Amino acid sequence: RLIIEVPHANDFLISTIKDENFINFTLWSQHLILHTKNSLNKFLDYAGFQNILIKGIQRYPLSNHLHWIINKKPGGHQSQFAFIDTNDLTKAYEQTLANLDSTDTLLAIAEIN
């Protein structure tokens, strides 16, 4: 069984907001390839994996997105905006981004026989 976590190419700040500072921060040498659900599925299938399950996960809350949009730098989850990150809002935001396929992270579980 393989469990892999990768940055999501459809991250809300990349695909919808198109925040150049965030894009430059995200596309660095450790992240040579960002995947979508489709590209990660094809990659794993080509490598011989089966029973592939890919789920979007949102690791950073709304405060982080606001901080990026306003201040153009990371750390929003620890910024002056962090007070808005109630459990209910965080869950709703995560679910909304998952429904839009715009989470920041993809988690894949696959098996090889």
Where are these regions (language model features)?
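Short secondary-structure boundary/capping segments
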Residues: 18-21, 69-70
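A C-terminal cap/extension of S-adenosyl-L-methionine-dependent methyltransferases
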Residues: 56-113
